[in-house]
């Protein structure tokens, strides 16, 4: 059995720092891939159509789609124009949306968090509430940015896991406490997506892709935050890492067989 660690791609956000544009990924995501999933993180620049997706996927054993301060541009799901001042990242959209679709179809394990969760819904034809706190009957799922990070990322509400679903199998519970740092949320659920968890106000908090043999899970909360201190978050990243290792074994075994032939 190979002892090599799986290579896990993490698409970057594009942002301005001083006068220059940078491609960046939050350290907490990189650390979660390395320490909790047991993979080798590979940062993928947000180059849109310049990314050679087919070639890239041959080099990857998994993909983590992260959260971000930016929102998916609404034209991707036929939504109304965003309010002035809304932060968008069109270069990330142009990279992650086609990359995620291709990865899932190719059987590459995918774990999507927060913005990544929203991207997965859009990829499968779903739509988003841009401000879920303004929807009647929904609670405010945003963090209080005036508080220290420890409090912003603290658990704030429960989510109920679908009976017999993947999350219940992984976490051994029907109810868990999660943090909440989002304004966008699922409006219309995408095709092929199966709900794995909901908040008490009915907001979808997790789903998986139904008809794929590989790991393809998305959560609205942030399990990457202090992941090594949270058994439930460790279980999620552990399952993702296991799927990536299995993908790596299958791919390398196939490559060896091809070389022998």
Predicted regions span which residues?
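N-terminal beta1-alpha1 cap of cysteine-dependent amidohydrolase-like domains
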Residues: 1-111, 122-124, 129, 133-171, ...
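Conserved G/P- and acidic residue-centered "switch" motifs that form tight phosphate/ATP-binding loops
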Residues: 114
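Hydrophobic, aromatic-enriched interface-forming segments
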Residues: 117-119
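A short, structured beta-strand/loop element
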Residues: 213-215
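Active-site-proximal beta-strand elements of phosphoester/diester hydrolases
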Residues: 217-220
